[in-house]
Design a protein with these regions (language model features):
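Conserved RNA-binding domains used in RNP assembly and mRNA/RNA metabolism
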Residues: 2-64
Length: 64
């Protein structure tokens, strides 16, 4: 897993992101937390928290 992605997510806590996973799912929400292996977002569509492993990420877009 790219250290650049981990660093960018950790620096983006509280920001809105669009996450594309390797299984072709996509989630849009606000990053609420991150550690070395996982990160959590508040999914805007379902209004629920989702936890993902960094290894599941194909692409991530951080929106300011």
């Amino acid at each position: 897993m790219s250290e650049l992605i981990k660093k960018r997510i950790s620096e983006s806590i509280g920001k809105v992101v669009l996450v594309f996973l390797k299984n072709n799912f996509r989630f849009e929400g606000k990053i609420t937390g991150a550690d070395k292996l996982y990160f959590e977002i508040l999914d805007f569509r379902t209004n629920s928290y989702k936890i993902f492993a960094f290894g599941e990420i194909k692409e991530i877009e951080v929106r300011e």
